[in-house]
Amino acid sequence: MPTIAIIGAGLMGRLIALSLNRQGYQVTLFDKDQKSGQQSAAYAAAGLLTPLGEAMHSPRNIVEMGFAALALWPKLLATLSGYNFFQQTGTLVVSHEQDIVDYTAQFFQKYLE
């Protein structure tokens, strides 16, 4: 099997490396930042997965892809060794009083059907 180099060890780079490694490829990850990933987008958002929270400002297909991805995380994490801190507890949407018309149960219900 050939060796594959992946430039960028953020979330996507790591997931691609994992997938290729499981297919038998030898993979090397390169990244300009620290190994801890403290400069990555996922670190900045604390790994927050909130497709419903993005619903006000994103096209419906983006929100639907977010829900599909959210369903995959427990399956992926179950295949990894070591500790992970994944909790799926729901979404709390907080808004200013003047925004209450935008954040109604009717708006969010269309994504939950």
Regions found by a protein language model. Give the residues of each.
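Flexible, glycine-rich phosphate/dinucleotide-binding loops
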Residues: 13, 35-36, 58
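Loop/helix-junction capping segments adjacent to catalytic residues or to phosphate/diphosphate-binding pockets
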Residues: 14, 39, 101
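Short glycine/serine/threonine-biased micro-segments
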Residues: 6-11, 44-45, 88
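Dinucleotide-binding Rossmann-like beta1-alpha1 core, especially the glycine-rich loop
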Residues: 47-113
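N-terminal Rossmann-like FAD-binding beta1-loop-alpha1 element of flavoenzymes
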Residues: 2-29
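Short secondary-structure boundary/capping segments within folded domains
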Residues: 19, 39-40, 83-86
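Aromatic-acidic/polar surface patches that form glycan- and anion
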Residues: 9, 42, 62, 66
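Glycine-rich FAD pyrophosphate-binding loop
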Residues: 21-43
